[in-house]
């Protein structure tokens, strides 16, 4: 699926069955490691986004501040010569990693992964440039909780609020954004009217989680 969307497998993990797919500024990690957090997450939720990462100025300071403000730590086992990345419990129990190593030659990928010979490390692919936003679907009455989670821990702010009503179903949505505007997370919950697409996702996914990831491109039609 990734390759059909223009992504290229550019690297593999040094010690685990994990692959790095890249296009533009987008990095997608495919984790096929057995008995890993990803494997247990998939067993509970099916194929899904089992984690995400925020770039921060100082990962350790951001992690310690998050814990002081009530975030729950997540301990991910690491192997030899592998970076230990600080992470907190995010939506649906998925780890939210805090990363301060990025840039050519100094990123987590340069340390934990081995680039494939003869493969362009920075493929243009189909023209997808970066992640535009990723959406969380949450239980009715929990949208305010997750909005406060991002506001409290990362100084996000609400930029839009939607109350979409249909004849039989509806949903409400808060669009949250990071202080620099580079991370955008719409939070969706079902309206009190009945069962619709949000409720359907929660049932199929077996809980709250990342419902979709949207990519930015200069030419959507192409």
What is each model feature region?
Residues 1-14, 22-75, 82, 87-161, ...:
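Glyoxalase I/VOC metalloenzyme domain signal
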């Amino acid at each position: 699926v990734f390759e059909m969307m223009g992504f290229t497998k550019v690297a593999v993990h040094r010690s685990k069955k994990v692959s790095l797919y890249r296009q533009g500024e987008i990095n997608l990690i495919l984790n096929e490691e057995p008995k890993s957090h990803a494997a247990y997450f998939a067993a509970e939720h099916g194929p899904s986004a089992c984690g995400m990462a925020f770039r921060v100025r100082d990962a350790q300071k951001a992690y310690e501040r998050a814990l002081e403000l009530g975030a729950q730590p997540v301990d991910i086992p690491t192997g030899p010569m592998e970076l230990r990345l600080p992470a907190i419990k995010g939506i649906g129990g998925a780890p939210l990693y805090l990363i301060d190593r990025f840039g050519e030659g100094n990123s987590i990928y340069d340390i934990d992964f081995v680039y494939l010979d003869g493969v362009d490390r920075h493929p243009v692919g189909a023209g997808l440039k970066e992640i535009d936003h990723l959406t969380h679907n949450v239980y009715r009455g929990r949208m305010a909780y997750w909005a406060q989670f991002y506001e409290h821990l990362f100084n996000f702010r609400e930029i839009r609020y939607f109350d979409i009503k249909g004849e039989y179903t509806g949903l409400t949505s808060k669009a949250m954004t990071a202080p620099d505007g580079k991370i955008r997370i719409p939070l969706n919950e079902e309206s009190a009217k009945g069962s619709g697409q949000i409720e359907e996702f929660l049932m199929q996914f077996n809980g709250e989680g990342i419902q979709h990831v949207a990519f930015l491109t200069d030419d959507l039609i192409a």
